[in-house]
Amino acid sequence: MSTQWWKESVVYQIYPRSFQDYNGDGIGDIPGIISRLDYLKTLGVDVIWLSPVYDSPNDDNGYDIRDYKAIMDEFGTMADWETLLAEIHTRGMKLIMDLVVNHSSDEHAWFVESRKSKDNPYRDFYIWRPGKDGKEPNNWASNFSGSAWTYDETTGEYYLHLFSKKQPDLNWENPKLREKIYEMMTWWLDKGIDGFRMDVINFISKVDGLPDAEPQPGQPYVSGSNYFMNGPNIHTYLQEMHENVLQHYDLMTVGEMPGVTLELAQLYTGEERNELNMVFQFEHVGLDQGPNGKWDLKPLELKDLKASLSRWQKGLQDIGWNSLYWNNHDQPRIVSRFGDDQSYRVESAKMLATLLHCMKGTPFIYQGEEIGMTNVRFDSIEQYQDIETLNMYKEKRAQGVPHETLMASIHAKGRDNARTPMQWDETKHGGFTDGTPWLEVNPNYKEINVKQALKDPNSIFYHYQKLIQLRKEHAILVHGSYDLILEDDPEIFAYKRTYNGQTLLVVCNFYGRITDFECPAEVVLSEPTLLLSNYDEEENGSYTSFRLRPYEARVYLGKNE
């Protein structure tokens, strides 16, 4: 495997709307981000991934782009953005931008033209179809509830939108559209950015004819994902993008890919194939949902998590590269999800960080994760802002599902869990804004905030800092091979990494009960040292056998015998 900077990096995701408000309007902005760069430098991250800051009507918080080459007024100006890039580079960090090209806003100039007439030169930049028997062209559901088609009276046809009706899908079969996209990507790269995170990039190729999905009783619209995820031309498009754009720069690329399998990821990230560096897969964050999808709650089984993460670790070894993440702007907070955000918040957050960051791949930290921010439990649906949450609530209430049932799902899985503003200190609104925040701050900001974390040498923040530092000091964390141990243990997630005559042993108690670790005989470390632990007081005893306290994590490094 070749050495590239993105393999040795740790990435920090900023959701600009919720990070830091500078001008007091209650909305995070670019000058706010600039004011916090020294904090990120202290943490030690190498790369900042900036969620969309492009001009947008904000139907889906910036993932509906009106102008790919302009900055959203609420966030600042292009001059502010250029200052941000320069300040990031001055501090020895890099910047990757969100690339949202499965769809645009319905207010984008291309779509405004496209809907004017059937023979408009921009008509085929989008996916237009006549209705079928007085109804939509097919039975696909939008990811945000309802039909994936909207009727447009001007031309009497429907346009496809896999997300909201203000996010029409772009037609990647049109070579002119692809040229425009590549030109726009090149424009940003020439400004000096260091790569892209590509939003739902495996949705861009649809199956010819856009066939109906398998109907389901009582459901007028059903997921058409079999016909647009990982579609027939996806590899062709990505290889063309690589040839026209990506190969000309020293970049990091990561493709967000719902429904991607390991076998497909081997193709998307295979070093010989010239597509992407890595993908975001969703297998491990789907393990706590029932058969009816995201809002259908079920407890996580540790054995499932071990099997899933280990399969991806082994499956991309020597072929491609893994992304490592627990959190992002669409996922609930990990300490609330897989940890204990009450009795063992600090211990479980550190354990989950250790478990992930010692694996092979590029770790991604989402803002607030490094201080153990938790899910929020708003009482009223009016307190929520997320379009996915609000549409789901409205649809399910109309079907007679009780308010309490829906709120339990929203408290566990709603995207606003990740979007409550960053908690900087104990002052009003957590130091995020002097105005009224666009989304309420989690009421626990007085106990959980950056100021408190920086004062406490045992905070979650310093544990993340240590994990990032260890990755820089020990090549085994970047390059070592991965093997799961104690596969059937119901409470311990343990694995080893091996590289260059060294073995790293990672042992994590996944629960709030005491449990005993017995190291398998085949794992032998000579001259072992305890590199990291999330408990203060030293317990005597060797790496071969010890008692694990609630959510305890230990990392040992030794030589191979």
Curated annotation (Swiss-Prot):
Gene3D superfamilies: Glycosidases, Golgi alpha-mannosidase II, Oligo-1,6-glucosidase, Domain 2
E.C. no: 3.2.1.10
Highest rank taxon of the organism: Bacteria
One biological process term in Gene Ontology: oligosaccharide catabolic process
Keyword Repressor found: no
Catalysed reactions, semicolon-separated: Hydrolysis of (1->6)-alpha-D-glucosidic linkages in some oligosaccharides produced from starch and glycogen by alpha-amylase, and in isomaltose
GO molecular function: alpha-amylase activity; oligo-1,6-glucosidase activity
Keyword Cytoplasm among record annotations: yes
Active-site annotation: 199 (nucleophile), 256 (proton donor)
Site residues by UniProt (Transition state stabilizer): 330
Pfam families from the UniProt entry: Alpha-amylase, Malt_amylase_C
Gene Ontology cellular-component terms listed: cytoplasm
UniProt entry keywords in alphabetical sequence: Cytoplasm, Glycosidase, Hydrolase
Location of this chain's protein in the cell: Cytoplasm
Family to which the UniProt record says this protein belongs: Belongs to the glycosyl hydrolase 13 family.
Protein name as it appears in the record: Oligo-1,6-glucosidase
Organism: Halalkalibacterium halodurans (strain ATCC BAA-125 / DSM 18197 / FERM 7344 / JCM 9153 / C-125) (Bacillus halodurans)
